[in-house]
Amino acid sequence: MEDLPEALVAEILKKITRTSDLNSLSLVSKQLYKMEGNQRGAIRVGSGLCTATKALKSLCARFPNLWKVEIDYSGWIPRHGKQLNNKGLFVFSSHCSSLTDLTLSFCSYIDDSGLRCLAYCKTLVSLRLKSAPEITSIGLFSVAVGCTSLSALHLIDCKKIDSVKWLEYLGRDGSLEELVVKYCKGIKHHDLLKFGSGWMKLQKFEFQGNGGIYGLCQGDVVYDSSYDAHSKNIYDFCCESLRDLRLAHIKTWPEVGLRAVLGKCKALEKLRLQYVHALNDNDLIALSRSCSNLKSISLWLNLQRYSSDVRYCETRTSFTDNSLYALALNCRMLQTVDLRFTGCASDWPSEIGFTQKGFLVLIQSCPIRVLVLNTANFFDDEGMKALSSSPCLETLELMMCEAVTDVGMRFIAHTPCLSSLTLRLCHEVTDVGVAELGHAHKLENLVIDCCSKVSLQAAQGVTKLVHYSRNISDAFMTVGLKDC
């Protein structure tokens, strides 16, 4: 290795991605040790890191071109040793001259003083704070003022951050393109509207409240299904650069709040609405009219009470077929659809606002490549028959779709481009239906999770890439419920 040209060695090092392999290789020779150290751009440290100032300075000298640092103390207990504190963070910020991306996770000994050190890090572009219990709005404001290049900010489970002066400053003088706020109980969704002109630059935005799937349920609250939050320009801001929007676990009544964003996104490509309360058809209709570029939509819906007439009230999910018709008419680039329904009983199909007719209008109007249906009680074998003629469908995931049987499997087996199929808790599908998939010889990947009437032997006969499990926890853990 000593005789190889440095340029060739550098290329070899670039192709090695595992940190353990890089560490081993650096011990082979002094040349490799130096070159690997100079080339390493990212490190992830946590429990076991020596927090002495001298050791941290030595680490920074070993890797002089670090641009990405992740400090993660998840699972930390006192016997693991000391955590990095404000003084240690100052060493990183002052000795890593190329630092642009910093993540602090479960750092219990870093507070506002530590964040003030980052204010001198003029190259910082991305900052992620996860479970930072001692950081408040004061420290965040110092970062907003000092880090003039900051374009991405993630705040997750930061319970002491409340005042939004930092947000107002970033909206007025900052350059944020990505903002993610989750589980920060001091920040309400309507506070985010104080971002003002900053919405113009934002390309990705996520806000998730503190409630779980049922955390916002209020059985005595009835929402107006005819209310139109977009008929008047209540908030004077634009978000024409926004491409990725996620709203989860928030109640948009009586405060309209972030609901207003839905009618202002002209460049939106990806939308995720997960257990947002009080929305109705008018919200998706307004969005569809301005978002002709929409390519992916995820709607996770639970039961709510709606009424447009004081004499009548119904319990159902937020949207009806009118929303599907609007999407079908205006969003002709839609490729990914994820529909999940929570708390809806199979013997009460009216609890879901969508019908199979409306759903198929959407599917047949757009080039859908990926389709996920969870507890879609309106969907049956006739729906599978219609789906089988979808010319672009490549990936299909069905979970707890009780009306889908072996007949549906026979239909879907002949879908022109279908290469990946996932069945979870679909108890009306048996070995007979799975055999139909094997006869078609089209699938490249098959996942069977907790389908009680499907055997491992039948699944293995379909294709080479098969995942099979009878463990019910596997079925739930792999469908994203951890994000609820």
Specify the residue positions occupied by each region the protein language model found.
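Eukaryotic tandem repeat interaction scaffolds
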Residues: G212, L273-V276, R289-E428
